[in-house]
Design a protein with these regions (language model features):
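Extracytosolic and intramembrane catalytic regions of membrane-associated proteins
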Residues: 36-226
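Internal/C-terminal transmembrane anchor helices
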Residues: 1-40
């Protein structure tokens, strides 16, 4: 399935959390997803994500902090997903990253048309394409569908959570000819074997939520001004 997410800073209300770690129990556990993340040009990292249902990042269990030196990181997701999280270095990069290929880039009638190829691995369970507000997205066409935006200057994320999205060609209609950076990520359910100790450290008063623990591998491409 495909979905288009429009993110605007003014639309997100973050809870300001101070003081001690909230009280959670086996009966009422905290939602904490663990993620192994690799992105182009950045070291691999572990992410502990508590931001579900738009509630923002809250303190993570002390057992996780003892297992890894997690720190609040506003750019933990490298824009693949909005908001921040707790992150810690995870050692050398170990995976091949997905790829973005520019197939055609042209301007006509005041609009920029960008055709791209997106390739993820055979292990991908889903993909995410991030288009920044600087691009002025009007529409995305792929697989016979056209998803339209109102052209508002906001960040956009195209999310496809099925394995058949591993290889896509998409056409972006843009109102801007400025330079910008596209980001593309594949999502794999579950963690690499090295994440087993973090799952143990999460303890029994915290549980994964929604799609659960994941491996996220991200690439990016800078589009020059046209």
């Amino acid at each position: 399935r495909l979905s288009l997410s429009i993110s605007a800073g003014a639309a997100i209300v973050l809870a300001v959390l101070t003081g001690l770690e909230p009280a959670y129990s086996k009966a009422s556990p905290q939602r904490v997803d663990l993620v192994y993340f690799e992105g182009a040009g950045a070291p691999a990292r572990w992410i502990a994500d508590t931001a579900w249902k738009g509630l923002g990042t809250e303190p993570i269990p002390q057992r996780l902090l003892r297992a890894e030196p997690f720190k609040r990181d506003a750019s933990a997701w490298q824009e693949i997903f909005p908001g921040g999280a707790y992150s810690a270095l995870a050692g050398p990069n170990a995976y091949f990253l997905p790829q973005i290929r520019v197939l055609q880039d042209r301007v006509a009638g005041g609009l920029r048309t960008l055709e791209i190829g997106l390739h993820a691995s055979a292990q991908a369970d889903g993909v995410v394409l991030y288009v920044p507000k600087e691009a002025g997205l009007r529409a995305i066409a792929l697989r016979g569908q056209t998803l339209e935006s109102d052209g508002a200057k906001v960040d956009t994320r195209l999310v496809c959570l099925t394995p058949d999205c591993r290889d896509l060609e998409a056409t972006l209609t843009l109102s801007s000819t400025k330079s910008f950076r596209l980001r593309f990520a594949e999502i794999r359910y579950g963690l690499p074997a090295s994440g087993a100790r973090l799952k143990i450290a999460r303890g029994d008063t915290a549980v994964p939520s929604q799609s659960g623990d994941e491996t996220v591998l991200a690439d990016s491409a800078v589009l020059p001004a046209h």
